[in-house]
Amino acid sequence: MGEITLVRHGQANSSATTEAGYDMLTELGHQQAEWLGHWIHAHDGPFDAVFAGSLRRQQETVAGMGFPDFTTDPRLNEIAYYDLTAEMEAKGLSAKRESPDDFATHFPATLNAWQEGKIDGSERYTDFTARVAGVIAEAAQPGKRILCVTSGGIIARAVADILHLDIAKMAQIALPILNTSVHRIHVTP
């Protein structure tokens, strides 16, 4: 049996209003990556291959975990949430988020609009689901342990695919995924 270990990046700038503003670890995010790395190296290694998305927060997390030799795979990049919400606001589909607490209601509404084709963002929803399915299929190697440092939307989509869940359930999975949390998928031949 193989195993895919999905890790969400460390804490990023949650007060950001743009993708670029969010895409950096906070001091705590760097510490979280280091703590998880110490634990993984002591209790959970080794891995046959290590991958990370190309986003700065993902790259900083995998490096902070002590994996200098990893492969960058942009298919592990997060949903471009800020781009999607900007498009929703421009089309009058939702009110502007006033605080980080609004995320719990705004995120599911954004995903629904995206899936329904009311907004496209930088990629269509169908392209997003295909890229997540593709990277998980490639990582699913019987007898191999693969580590992927990614983001909450990717983890939620992977779980939703495995469990055949709809977009509303995917949103429920995504919301509580914590920074540097570990999610395992067992791979059977």
PLM region spans:
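Active-site-proximal alpha-helix that buttresses catalytic centers in soluble enzyme cores
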Residues: 2-73, 126
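Generic beta-sheet signal
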Residues: 4, 144-150
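Short aromatic-enriched loop/helix-cap "lid" or pocket-rim segments at secondary-structure transitions
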Residues: 16-19, 63, 81-86, 160-161
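Glycine-rich phosphate-binding loop signature in dinucleotide/nucleotide-binding domains
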Residues: 43-46, 139-144
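Short beta-strand scaffold positions
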Residues: 52-53, 130, 149-150
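Phosphate-handling substructures
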Residues: 66-131
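GST superfamily/GST-like fold recognition
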Residues: 152-156
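Domain-level recognition of soluble alpha/beta enzyme cores
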Residues: 166-188
